[in-house]
Curated annotation (Swiss-Prot):
Signal peptide: none annotated. GO terms for molecular function: rRNA binding; structural constituent of ribosome. SUPFAM superfamilies: Ribosomal protein L4. Gene3D superfamilies: 3.40.1370.10. InterPro entries: Ribosomal_uL4 (IPR002136), Ribosomal_uL4-like (IPR013005), Ribosomal_uL4_dom_sf (IPR023574). The keyword Chloroplast does not apply. This is Large ribosomal subunit protein uL4. The gene is rplD. Belongs to the universal ribosomal protein uL4 family. Coiled coil: none annotated.
């Protein structure tokens, strides 16, 4: 099994922690990661775009002139697409862009990006965080002690505690609970910080 250093909140080392090789030591599959990112970005699209077709534009119920005898081209409505102010043909309508990859593919994608963090030495495991109240400044000091000065994803066992409240207002810091870890957030941040409890929870789900 692979080992990584276990840190305390003050930045000091507290031994090593073993990682499950089936999650943290696989060969990263870039194609699957790409597919997972596209899927996740698609699900973030609002899909509220809309235009009015000829049935939705107000007016146009009366034939503008009689069918024959005027010498002009026949017309049935002033809201036909060829008219100024007419409806739009084949325009966008509200829709959902979300779709799902197979469960095994999604799991392979998250395992691939987690393994890549180990390969790049961008994984940091902390035994636990302890804050008596939401203190953004104190969490910033913790990051300095851990020598983290870039975009970082912090994964906690539970996102509803003082640690999450302390970290969420810092620029370049993203906080998610262990059951909310995802490919897009892992790829979008250079460093990955896990608590020991979050690590256990991730391995329990993905193993």
């Amino acid at each position: 099994m692979a080992n990584v250093t276990l840190f305390k909140q003050d930045g000091s080392q507290n031994g090593n922690v073993e990682l499950n090789d089936s999650i943290w030591a696989i060969e990263p599959n870039e194609n699957v990661v790409f597919d997972a990112i596209i899927m996740q970005r698609a699900s973030l699209r609002q899909g509220t775009h809309a235009v009015k077709n000829r049935s939705a534009v107000r007016g146009g119920g009366r034939k503008p002139w009689r069918q024959k005898g005027t010498g002009r081209a026949r017309q049935g409505s002033i809201r036909s697409p060829q008219w100024r102010g007419g409806g739009v043909v084949f325009g966008p309508t509200p829709r959902s862009y979300s779709y799902k990859l197979p469960r095994k593919v999604r799991r392979l994608a998250i395992k691939s990006v987690l393994s890549q963090k180990v390969i790049d030495n961008d994984l940091i495991v902390v035994d636990s965080f302890s804050f008596d109240a939401p203190k953004t400044k104190e969490f910033a000091e913790v990051l300095n002690k851990l020598d983290v000065n870039t975009k970082v994803l912090v994964v906690l066992e539970d996102g509803n505690d003082f640690t999450a409240l302390s970290a969420r207002n810092l620029p370049n810091v993203t906080v998610v609970p262990a059951d909310g870890i995802n490919v897009l957030d892992v790829v979008g941040n250079q460093k990955l910080i896990l608590t020991q409890a979050a690590l256990s929870k991730i391995e329990e789900v993905l193993a």
